[in-house]
């Protein structure tokens, strides 16, 4: 007779932390320079005028203004721009 109960092992029991991706500032909203507009994996949204592209493909405002989303070109690329308010 065994004196210890046989202990099984599981290959589950792990989970990754949430990455909080997505659009942070929507079209028509005011934004300050340096603020994040979109956090993404890859370029689902492409930078337009007044928008910078970070090392992890994060889009951020280069100027103060209003956010504009548009679809451009034959490839129907979704572009994000920041239009400076006069």
UniProtKB/Swiss-Prot annotation:
It holds the Pfam family Ribosomal_L27. One of its GO terms (cellular component) is cytosolic large ribosomal subunit. Keywords: Ribonucleoprotein, Ribosomal protein. The gene is rpmA. It comes from Xanthomonas oryzae pv. oryzae (strain KACC10331 / KXO85). GO terms for molecular function: structural constituent of ribosome. One of its GO terms (biological process) is translation. This is Large ribosomal subunit protein bL27. The keyword Lipid biosynthesis does not apply. Belongs to the bacterial ribosomal protein bL27 family.
